[in-house]
From Swiss-Prot:
<keyword id="KW-0963">Cytoplasm</keyword>
<dbReference type="GO" id="GO:0005737">
    <property type="term" value="C:cytoplasm"/>
</dbReference>
<keyword id="KW-0227">DNA damage</keyword>
<feature type="binding site">
    <location>
        <position position="42"/>
    </location>
    <ligand>
        <name>Mg(2+)</name>
    </ligand>
</feature>
<protein>
    <recommendedName>
        <fullName>Endonuclease V</fullName>
        <ecNumber>3.1.21.7</ecNumber>
    </recommendedName>
</protein>
<dbReference type="InterPro" id="IPR007581">
    <property type="entry name" value="Endonuclease-V"/>
</dbReference>
<feature type="binding site">
    <location>
        <position position="110"/>
    </location>
    <ligand>
        <name>Mg(2+)</name>
    </ligand>
</feature>
<keyword id="KW-0378">Hydrolase</keyword>
<keyword id="KW-0234">DNA repair</keyword>
<keyword id="KW-0460">Magnesium</keyword>
<dbReference type="GO" id="GO:0016891">
    <property type="term" value="F:RNA endonuclease activity, producing 5'-phosphomonoesters"/>
</dbReference>
<dbReference type="GO" id="GO:0006281">
    <property type="term" value="P:DNA repair"/>
</dbReference>
<comment type="similarity">
    <text>Belongs to the endonuclease V family.</text>
</comment>
<keyword id="KW-0255">Endonuclease</keyword>
<keyword id="KW-0540">Nuclease</keyword>
<dbReference type="GO" id="GO:0000287">
    <property type="term" value="F:magnesium ion binding"/>
</dbReference>
<dbReference type="Pfam" id="PF04493">
    <property type="entry name" value="Endonuclease_5"/>
</dbReference>
């Protein structure tokens, strides 16, 4: 596929102001019921083609097995800017999540929740937009200092615990509440979804695997687990018809 530059008007300062306004909608409160399903969201990008791949994987908390998987592929015009990840990734993650056959009890996003310079990372943004409890799971710390406390190591800023660290370097993740959940609940769910011997929660791990695999297919290779391929359904954005054949050849169902 030939490279196509996709440009759009984007103001980082306006986006940051929007985050400050939207964070007023964030509520950190206990879950109303015990969750049974968790949705993992992640996105990957083919820089050569300017295409983003958003993956939404719904898993059972009881078995940690995927029960549904949707992918949305589209051209992306917003650049990567630290702290403003949601404005780039929601363009492909939100349509993937909307295509799922059932709503998740909790959404887990590869990125931060309130452990963010404006207390409104991508997990908080997703939670507010989808109106679902959300958790951020990130591989790097954005703000705060590490302080040891009861139950583990915490990310603390201005006396507030924003996230808890699971694992040890270099195999560690920073778990923070995004919306409609407490830090303790977010940590408990994240721990419960890490398989023995692993270090990443299964919902975001699978979403990461799938989004990167499809990015590889877009780049001209075929590398995807056949079991995942049989589960995932893919929707293409405008003017991406040329991707349908290689995706079908890789065993994916294209809608």
């Amino acid at each position: 596929m030939n490279r196509r530059e996709v440009r759009c008007a984007f103001s980082a300062s306006k986006a940051a102001r929007a985050q400050l306004l939207l964070r007023g909608k964030v509520r950190l409160e206990p879950l109303p019921t015990r969750p049974r399903t968790v949705l993992g969201l992640d996105a990957s990008y083919s820089a050569k083609d300017g295409v983003g791949v958003g993956a939404a994987v719904l898993i059972s908390l009881e078995t940690l097995e995927p029960v549904d998987c949707r992918v949305y592929i589209s051209r992306v015009c917003i650049p990567y800017i630290p702290g403003l990840l949601a404005f780039r990734e929601l363009a492909v993650m939100a349509p993937a999540a909307a295509a799922l056959s059932a709503e998740a009890d909790v959404v887990m996003v590869d990125g931060h929740g309130i452990a963010h310079p404006r207390r409104f990372g991508i997990a908080s943004h997703v939670g507010v937009i989808l109106e679902r409890p959300s958790i951020g799971v990130a591989k790097k710390k954005l703000v705060g200092t590490l302080v040891e406390g009861p139950g583990g190591m915490y990310v603390v800023q201005d006396g507030e615990r924003l996230a808890i660290v699971l694992g040890t370097r270099p195999r560690e993740v920073y778990v923070s509440p995004g919306h409609r959940i407490t830090l303790e609940e977010a940590a408990s769910i994240a721990r419960a979804t890490i398989r023995p011997g692993g270090w990443m929660p299964e919902p975001t791990r699978l979403a990461d695997v799938i989004s990167k695999a499809l990015k590889t297919i877009i780049g001209g290779q075929s590398l995807i687990n056949s079991a995942l391929a049989s589960l995932c359904r893919v929707k293409l954005g405008p003017r991406l018809e040329e991707l349908e054949r290689p995706l079908r050849r890789a065993g994916l169902e294209v809608e």
